[in-house]
């Protein structure tokens, strides 16, 4: 072994080790563990004697002033690094819509409609609880409406080791649509000045990015400047900059140039290359920067939990979210006779609806826009978001782990890289006595390209 290694060029050894690290980071459990570790470190640090150092790190400003991008490290993590995660999530979502389980419109309608219910119901629960607290309290009606995609998928990766791949697809679709609705709510109800010119100008680098990819131009020296320009323009418009990541992902071709070849599509190549960066850097650093909420001891916790606004946020996340998701899912499946999909059960939907109650990124952002930073109510909102998200995650773990004690263990797809597991995804249920139709994975275009 050592002799062989000595014979290899140094660059080959480095590339091989880097490849192994990248493979580890592509596993959902690894990314989830890193994200949760970052969140735990942030919470401990923010409530320790060294909390001042944590605040100083988050508020440290860096970036070009002449581009109005002199942002704090916390802002760079929230608007910049998280855009990388949204790009990867957008790639996964487009793949499912084009070649995966959501390519049938009736099947895709279920998680999309569930996301709408998951926005409306928490807002309604919040308003009912805070109606008597005055108009100022009602400003936070949208706080429990958002789902944190990164945290929700991380928790699912850790607790859902034997869930069918369709569970992750449903949650991913629901969470992305949920957050896009929440971002639109911010643009309409919480943005004091929306700059239309940079928003419209975003179309220029976006179209150029799409044209290059359609012509199979993959030079990073051409694509990266266009992507950064699109991100900067979205940021300058006042819209949450992570939207740029989703927009860029949606223009990446999801099919190979020649569909009857085994060559991977550009979308698969991009996802394979960028996913380790998202899981190993972007998401854990974001968690470290955003999850540090100062609770203030037992007294601070009691004070927060007696505030109607905090109670409304927790109830919206823990009660409103699952209520809205389950109710709308039930309604859509009954009206359209679509069914839940491959290997999905109502136990899965109940657990996923609780995972949708994990609100961090966009919820914290709406909290900052609703109540002035440094005020007691703003601190209460942050504590409520952490508490509600933690309760939702624990309940989801209890629900989603139950069926697998007696269930099959062959679908260990969420714990591994979803790309590798997709070929073994479960097939649709059929009536007794009928054969099960063959299903071709999204990563097997050579065998049977999607129509």
Swiss-Prot record:
According to UniProt, the reaction catalysed is: Na(+)(in) + 2 H(+)(out) = Na(+)(out) + 2 H(+)(in)
The annotated regions of Polar residues compositional bias extend over: 437-451
Sorted keywords for this record are:
Antiport, Cell membrane, Ion transport, Membrane, Sodium, Sodium transport, Transmembrane, Transmembrane helix, Transport
Q: Where in the cell is it found?
A: Cell membrane
Primary residence: membrane
Q: Which GO terms describe its molecular function?
A: sodium:proton antiporter activity
Question: Can you tell me where the transmembrane regions are?
Answer: 32-52, 71-91, 109-129, 140-160, 169-189, 193-213, 220-242, 282-302, 312-332, 354-374, 380-400
Topology within the bilayer: Multi-pass membrane protein
GO BP term, example: regulation of pH
Entry keyword Transmembrane: yes
Disulfide bonds listed in the record? none
Q: Where is the composition biased (Low complexity)?
A: 421-433
List GO terms (cellular component aspect).
plasma membrane
Region annotation Disordered: where it falls in the sequence: 407-451
Q: What does this protein do?
A: Na(+)/H(+) antiporter that extrudes sodium in exchange for external protons.
Q: Which PANTHER family match?
A: NA(+)_H(+) ANTIPORTER NHAA, SODIUM ION/PROTON ANTIPORTER NHAA-RELATED
Family membership noted in the UniProt record: Belongs to the NhaA Na(+)/H(+) (TC 2.A.33) antiporter family.
Q: What is this protein called?
A: Na(+)/H(+) antiporter NhaA 3
Q: Which organism is it from?
A: Salinispora arenicola (strain CNS-205)
